[in-house]
């Protein structure tokens, strides 16, 4: 009987039983959601920390790896030899001599040849040395020369064409040397000095001075000339021929025999003293001159 009562009571209570609300499941869901966000937040923060740490490390320990082109350039720069110095770049002349604004002074330094000159040279003073010869090579690359002075050397020979490229040369002094003949002279000379040499008349070509239309001063004194050079240009003002071996002159030496009206008015001085010639025997040789030559008339 008691068993039957218990069974009936159980049947009455079963419909009233409801499942408990899924609080644990909900809280687990909420927890899971929070965990996911937390893990994502942690991951993000961790990534940013690592990125910042990595950036700091890179900034401190950055190693730049050059590309192939820059490596080759550095290699080329390292192995490319310097260009050899040119002879003129070393400027040996300016160590031995004095170079000032286009002028080179090589006086009394015992040189026996023309030294290499700076290309911009305009004036060379090489007086009182031991130079024996002048060559075309000496001035081949110095086109701006205007004055050359070789007074007091031992020059015996001047190579053909030595002055051929010196189109601007105005003054040339070869005084006090050992010359037997004259070289071909550049066309723009205004002054030529070859006194105190051993030049004879056969050492001067017939037209040596003819085309020198700017020649103003001619010094050939103290040589061995037997006659006055022919075809002297009209531009001459001063002619020094003293102390040679000149024994005679003609009516055409300074004047024009067939033109009695001809006046050579530019000549200011002719010196003929110290020669065997007696000027008084040649009166017609000076009728075109404004001043008589200096010399012996008796």
From Swiss-Prot:
GO biological process: articular cartilage development; bone development; negative regulation of smooth muscle cell proliferation
Record-linked SUPFAM superfamilies: L domain-like (SSF52058)
Residues carrying a glycan: 80, 88, 214, 258
Localization, UniProt: Secreted, Extracellular space, Extracellular matrix
Superkingdom of origin: Eukaryota
Tissue specificity note: Bone.
LRR repeats: 112-131, 132-155, 156-179, 180-199, 200-225, 226-246, 247-277
GO MF terms, alphabetically ordered: growth factor activity
Protein name as annotated: Mimecan
């Amino acid at each position: 009987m008691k068993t039957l009562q218990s069974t009936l009571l159980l049947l009455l209570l079963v419909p009233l039983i409801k499942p408990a609300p899924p609080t644990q499941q909900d809280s687990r869901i909420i927890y899971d959601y929070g965990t996911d966000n937390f893990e994502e937040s942690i991951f993000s923060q961790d990534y940013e920390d690592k990125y910042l740490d990595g950036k700091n490390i890179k900034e401190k320990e950055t190693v730049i790896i050059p590309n192939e082109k820059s490596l080759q350039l550095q290699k080329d720069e390292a192995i490319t030899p310097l260009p050899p110095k040119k002879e003129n770049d070393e400027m040996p002349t300016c160590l031995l001599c004095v170079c000032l604004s286009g002028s080179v002074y090589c006086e009394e330094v015992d040189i026996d040849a023309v030294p290499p000159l700076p290309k911009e040279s305009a004036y060379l003073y090489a007086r009182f040395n031991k130079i024996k010869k002048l060559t075309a090579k000496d001035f081949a690359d110095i086109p701006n020369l205007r004055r050359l002075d070789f007074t007091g050397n031992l020059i015996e020979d001047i190579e053909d064409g030595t002055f051929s490229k010196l189109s601007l040369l105005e003054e040339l002094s070869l005084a006090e040397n050992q010359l037997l003949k004259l070289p071909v002279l550049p066309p723009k000379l205004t002054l030529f000095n070859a006194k105190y040499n051993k030049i004879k008349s056969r050492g001067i070509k017939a037209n040596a001075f003819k085309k020198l239309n700017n020649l103003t001063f001619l010094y050939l004194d103290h040589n061995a000339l037997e006659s006055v050079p022919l075809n002297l240009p009209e531009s001459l003002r001063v002619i020094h021929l003293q102390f040679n071996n000149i024994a005679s002159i003609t009516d055409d030496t300074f004047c024009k025999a067939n033109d009695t009206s001809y006046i050579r008015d530019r000549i200011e001085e002719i010196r003929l003293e110290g020669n065997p010639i007696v000027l008084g025997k040649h009166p017609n040789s000076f009728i075109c001159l404004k001043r008589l030559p200096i010399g012996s008339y008796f």
